[in-house]
């Protein structure tokens, strides 16, 4: 009997551990993929025909971003593109459970066709050290020129270093020695709208009707149920506010439709930027160097010739 109880206990413990492991894997995956996966699941291309990056559909506030990189690169060369997402690292955002926490950052980098994430064996130790423990992925398996990352801790990675490999027109017939645009989208903090159109708890909530607030019920797990006596039809409307936003109204107050019931807890935002890069022809560079060298030599010979002429003139005057 005792052996049977021990067996049952071990069986239950094994099941419990398995469930906990699965929950950990699922929640970890959903958090780590939260930023890119929303866009990846809903949009074939992260940049619309208007030039707008689709992340702006969920991250409504506008914030600055910046990108730094070389003005020109040679073919088949690894270079770094530095994405800067500045914000006050002391700020806290509303998390999904309504509590306050640190902000994460994420970014999407849209490179010209042919440019791609550098393979690990081509990344120099200097660039690898600047990258830290960042993990990049392609927006689509067949879209190697579009790279996404995030969310990652903003306090540690307000600057993201992307290792990029330039194409070689000698082997890639689609690549040409031209000037190309690079597009960037970067965000800090959570979004306000989910891809299905529903609101997150990181945004302002407004009244759905005009009337008097007859009751405010605080839920056990956080958030509020706000009952409004509708003055237009005499009925009642119940507005739900999730945990996170702070109420701005009180019981007995007269409110109007679309009047904010809460503050706007969002402290993050999304921004777009762009840059240009030239895929430089090595022969053109060599030609330019030869031209500059010839100009310098010509100047030297001209100076020497002038001095020689002055000496001849001086000798003739002495005669």
UniProtKB/Swiss-Prot annotation:
Primary localization class, coarse: plastid
Pfam family, any one: Apocytochr_F_N
GO CC field: chloroplast thylakoid membrane
Name of the molecule in the record: Cytochrome f
Annotated positions binding heme: 35, 55, 58-59
Subcellular location: Plastid, Chloroplast thylakoid membrane
Family: Belongs to the cytochrome f family.
Function: Component of the cytochrome b6-f complex, which mediates electron transfer between photosystem II (PSII) and photosystem I (PSI), cyclic electron flow around PSI, and state transitions.
GO MF terms, alphabetically ordered: electron transfer activity; heme binding; iron ion binding
Claim: DNA damage is one of the keywords in the record: no
The organism of origin for this protein: Picea abies
Cofactor: heme
High-level lineage: Eukaryota, Viridiplantae, Streptophyta, Embryophyta, Tracheophyta
GO terms of biological process kind: photosynthesis
Keywords, ordered alphabetically: Chloroplast, Electron transport, Heme, Iron, Membrane, Metal-binding, Photosynthesis, Plastid, Signal, Thylakoid, Transmembrane, Transmembrane helix, Transport
Cofactor: record remark: Binds 1 heme group covalently.
């Amino acid at each position: 009997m005792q052996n049977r109880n021990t067996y049952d206990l071990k069986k239950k413990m094994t099941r419990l551990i398995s469930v906990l492991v699965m929950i950990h894997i699922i929640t970890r995956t959903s958090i780590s993929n939260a930023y890119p996966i929303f866009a990846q699941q809903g949009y074939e291309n992260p940049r619309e025909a208007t030039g707008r990056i689709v992340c702006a559909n969920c991250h409504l506030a506008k914030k600055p971003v910046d990108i730094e990189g070389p003005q020109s690169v040679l073919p088949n060369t690894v270079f770094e593109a530095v994405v800067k997402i500045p914000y006050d690292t002391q700020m806290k955002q509303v998390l999904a459970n309504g509590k306050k926490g640190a902000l994460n950052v994420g970014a999407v980098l849209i490179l010209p066709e042919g440019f791609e994430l550098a393979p690990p064996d081509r990344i120099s130790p200097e660039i690898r050290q600047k990258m830290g423990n960042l993990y990049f992925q392609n927006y689509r398996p067949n879209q190697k020129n579009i790279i996404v990352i995030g969310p990652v801790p903003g306090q540690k990675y307000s600057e993201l270093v992307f290792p990029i490999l330039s194409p070689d027109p000698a082997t890639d017939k689609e690549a040409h020695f031209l000037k190309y645009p690079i597009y960037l989208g970067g965000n800090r903090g959570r979004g306000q709208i989910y891809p299905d159109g529903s609101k997150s708890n990181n945004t302002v909530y407004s009244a759905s009707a005009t009337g008097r607030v007859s009751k405010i019920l605080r839920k056990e797990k956080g958030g509020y149920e706000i009952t409004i006596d509708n003055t237009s039809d005499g009925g009642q409307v119940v507005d739900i506010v999730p945990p996170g936003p702070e109420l701005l109204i009180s019981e007995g107050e007269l409110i109007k439709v679309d009047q904010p019931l809460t503050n706007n807890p969002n402290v993050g935002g999304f921004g777009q930027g762009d840059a240009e890069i030239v895929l430089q022809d090595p022969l053109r560079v060599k030609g330019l160097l030869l031209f500059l060298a010839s100009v310098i030599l010509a100047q030297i010979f001209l100076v020497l010739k002038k001095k020689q002429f002055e000496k001849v003139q001086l000798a003739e005057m002495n005669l």
